[in-house]
Amino acid sequence: MMPVSVGRNRGVSRSKGIRMAQLGSPISIEAMEAFLSARIETGAVPGLSVSVVKGDRSVWAKGFGFADLATSSPATPQTSYLWFSMTKIVTATAVLRLAEGGKLDLDAPAGEYFRGFKVISQPTPVTVRQLLNHSSGLANPLPIRWVRPADAPDPDRGAFVRRLLAKHRRLKSVPGERASYSNLGYLVLGEVISEITGASYEEYVREEILSPLGMDSTGFTYPEQPAGDGAATGYQPLWRPFTPLFRAALPRGVVGPRQGRYVAFNPFYVKGPAYGGIVGGVGEATRLVVLHLNGGQADGKRLLSAQAVAEMQRITPRGGKRDFGLGWFRSHEARGRRPAFVEHLGGGAGFWNVMRIYPEESLGVVVMGNITSYDHESICDTIISVPWE
């Protein structure tokens, strides 16, 4: 979501994990854990929290490394990370829930629900569905400054979105013609949800998605507990001479002190939570995975129909780098891979996350890490090499 990649990240080659998956040789949980521990030991990432879902339950969850380097607080399944764009799965789930409740039509113009949605008109208007699957034609402006320190006031949400739309009124393509990722489209969806329900995006999501799933520690603010039991600190590997430029690139108060080869980030929030604002841990994120692996039902509670869940996972428009469903996507490199999967990544300043489901295997993986970038592919490939039961 926020590309910040100045400096050197001593990542680990993705080949080891991919070789495991391609060879098809099952590995033990112990071997998988050793692989994940090595990511910490080699400096690929300060801390990782990982969970696995099989069928309708979480079968494994563990933390590796540190949630906070200054205090040596360990990363755990309960450690909260800023989800960034992984939030879009929640936003899409919320929109589909409204559609199934008869509150909106996915194929109706989005402007019918959010009157502030004004763009230079094409022959056909932008629909809600096209916002969900990134085929609206909306631009994707760099969101590097769409953040604020956690102690700064939250701006007027609607006014913020209207200002962005005023700057990007001209669509890049005819709606529905092709797919191109747009954070702005999901900001508009957040306003659609708010206009329809009369509640804020956060209030609706808490009441209709997070609370029914028992995701009580997941929300839109950082927990008050110490790091490890609370929130992870995000890090960016950065050469020291670049530190002043890095501070200037982000809003004042977001970039924190240096810690060894890293720059730490102070707690911050995104402006417009519908595109990337959820804060939570892998332990509770598995409940969202269970919902999408089990036809819209989790712990005996149905939030979506099986048809709606299938529609979200059905990949239709093809984009330049990814092919999209409603919320979910997959990269071009994943076409034809087995087992097939859909996913959503979430990355920005100090954090990189992935939520991936393998519907044919009834398997789901959530990985959260507190560095701007790391190789999640080898991690996922290694995890699915375990014969989960």
Where are the language model's segments positioned?
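N-terminal amphipathic/basic-hydrophobic helices that include classical n-h-c signal peptides
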Residues: 1-19
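Short, conserved catalytic-motif segment at the N-terminal edge
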Residues: 23-83, 103, 113, 163-171
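Short, surface-exposed loop or secondary-structure junction motifs
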Residues: 68, 121-347
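Catalytic tyrosine of NAD(P)H-dependent dehydrogenase/reductases that use a Tyr as the general acid/base
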Residues: 81-84, 179-181
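Short, glycine/proline-biased beta-turn/loop segments that scaffold the active-site neighborhood
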Residues: 106-120, 211-213
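Short, gly/Ser/Thr-rich active-site loops of penicillin-recognizing serine hydrolases
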Residues: 321, 337-339, 367-389
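Short, well-ordered beta-strand elements
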Residues: 341-344, 352-371
